[in-house]
């Protein structure tokens, strides 16, 4: 959530920055609410001052034994007016808060201006795509003989789910272990095990609610109380960013404890609303997928340096696996709702002859921290908002896809990347099932 003072100081400048990311701010509606808020606040303050003055008069009149009934009647009338004004002011404040929750973050000045993904800017490219001397197969065809099973997953659950068997399941586990070991032992992250369901307050804190509710899987439950039963919703996490970032919700962290670096491996659950017809074949876009997530909580002055570091931490996994990739900076029109700057890592997918996203690394600035009231205190100073960052380190399923395609052999086998072999008991090749 943005600081409402930015809107009060120069709403036109804010509107212009938001327009670069395709968001049209209703300036007139905001200004109308602000004008009424100011008028009500002024009226309330004047009425309170008048009531206080009259209350003193009542005391003086009674002290002299004089009739104070007329003044008391006026105080009663002021009380009724104040009550109505306070109720209307609460309505306006709630409406403003609702508006603020729906407004995306402001893009950082270093972010290229653009309308969509075609205007993202490549920052660097690492590794050269392999030149095959046989017809390249996609990961579905390669995996079919190695234990990648969509049919059974459809029978058990439905579309956009998959099952892994044997060596392929072991490789999936090995990838998770490699990622966690790298981030904890080399990059200084603390491994966390987190709930896979969170409450609505956590989803609001990181920005999934209220805007993206249709993308979430909701788990309603009945909660009993003295007033009877009510329905309370849990949500399956779309990313471990949600529980990890909410660790600091409603907290004041001592400045000397920052930065905080958390890493977690979790399944992620997404309804993929609005994705009908996209990536229907294979593991690229699923309702459930594994991901190793990186989250950092840092002082404001360090967040953009931290973004470069976090992006490098995600890149390190691709380098260890020797997978060709490129890093791009997203333009204003392609950034996520809460981000002020984002780098995407895209891995080479031979069967598609293109790079596909495998990690998104974002600096959220104080956008999430303001929603969560996540603050730090340096020494004896006043509490101030922290900055939060997150990134995939990496999406496990898409990493598996990249290995199946980039390391495939003409005989249907897949070479195990050298970095994974210690996690797979020295196995160097996955052979097709007979």
Curated annotation (Swiss-Prot):
ATP-binding recorded as keyword: yes
Database matches in InterPro entries: aa-tRNA-synt_IIb (IPR002314), aa-tRNA-synth_II (IPR006195), aa-tRNA-synth_II/BPL/LPL (IPR045864), Ser-tRNA-ligase_type_1 (IPR002317), Ser-tRNA-synth_1_N (IPR015866), SerRS_1_N_sf (IPR042103), SerRS_core (IPR033729), tRNA-bd_arm (IPR010978)
Chief location: cytoplasm
Annotated metabolic or biological route of this protein: Aminoacyl-tRNA biosynthesis; selenocysteinyl-tRNA(Sec) biosynthesis; L-seryl-tRNA(Sec) from L-serine and tRNA(Sec): step 1/1
GO cellular component, one term: cytoplasm
EC code: 6.1.1.11
Recorded GO MF terms: ATP binding; serine-tRNA ligase activity
Keywords: Aminoacyl-tRNA synthetase, ATP-binding, Cytoplasm, Ligase, Nucleotide-binding, Protein biosynthesis
Listed HAMAP family: Ser_tRNA_synth_type1
Family membership noted in the UniProt record: Belongs to the class-II aminoacyl-tRNA synthetase family. Type-1 seryl-tRNA synthetase subfamily.
Quaternary structure and partners: Homodimer. The tRNA molecule binds across the dimer.
Protein name per Swiss-Prot or TrEMBL: Serine--tRNA ligase
């Amino acid at each position: 959530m943005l600081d409402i003072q930015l809107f009060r100081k120069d709403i036109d400048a804010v509107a212009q920055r938001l327009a670069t990311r395709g968001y049209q701010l209703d300036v007139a509606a905001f200004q109308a609410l602000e004008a009424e808020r100011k008028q009500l606040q002024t009226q309330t303050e004047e009425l309170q001052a008048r009531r206080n003055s009259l209350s003193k008069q009542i005391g003086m009149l009674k002290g002299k034994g004089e009739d104070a009934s007329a003044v008391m009647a006026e105080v009663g009338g002021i009380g009724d007016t104040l009550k109505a004004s306070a109720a209307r002011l609460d309505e306006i404040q709630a409406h403003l808060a609702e508006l603020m929750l729906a407004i995306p973050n402001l893009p950082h000045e270093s972010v290229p201006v653009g309308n969509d993904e075609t205007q993202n800017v490549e920052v660097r490219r690492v590794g050269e795509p392999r030149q095959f001397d046989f017809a390249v197969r996609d990961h579905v065809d390669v995996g079919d003989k190695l234990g990648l099973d969509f049919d059974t997953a459809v029978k058990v659950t439905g579309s956009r789910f998959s099952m892994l068997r044997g060596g392929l399941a072991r490789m999936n586990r090995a990838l998770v272990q490699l990622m966690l070991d790298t981030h904890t032992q080399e990059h200084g992250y603390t491994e966390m095990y987190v709930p896979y369901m969170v409450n609505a307050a956590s989803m609001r804190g990181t920005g999934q609610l209220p805007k993206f509710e249709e993308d979430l899987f909701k788990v309603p439950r009945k909660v009993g109380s003295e007033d009877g039963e009510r329905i309370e919703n849990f949500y399956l996490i779309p990313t471990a960013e949600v529980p990890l970032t909410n660790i600091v919700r409603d907290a004041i962290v001592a400045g000397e404890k920052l930065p905080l670096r958390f890493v977690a491996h979790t399944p992620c659950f997404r309804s993929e609303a609005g994705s009908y017809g996209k990536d229907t074949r294979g593991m690229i876009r699923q309702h459930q997928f594994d991901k190793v997530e990186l989250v950092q909580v840092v002082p404001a002055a360090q967040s953009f340096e931290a973004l470069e570091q976090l992006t490098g931490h995600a890149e390190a996994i691709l380098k260890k696996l020797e997978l060709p990739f490129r890093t791009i900076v997203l333009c204003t029109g392609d950034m996520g709702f809460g981000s002020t700057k984002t780098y995407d890592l895209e891995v080479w997918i031979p069967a598609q002859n293109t790079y596909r996203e495998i990690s998104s690394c974002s600096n959220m600035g104080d956008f999430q921290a303001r929603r969560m009231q996540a603050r730090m205190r340096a020494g004896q100073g006043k509490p101030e908002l922290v900055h939060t960052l997150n990134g995939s380190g990496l999406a496990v399923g898409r990493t598996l896809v990249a290995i199946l395609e980039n390391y495939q052999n003409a005989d249907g086998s897949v070479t195990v990347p050298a970095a994974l072999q210690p996690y797979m008991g020295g196995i160097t090749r996955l052979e097709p099932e007979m």
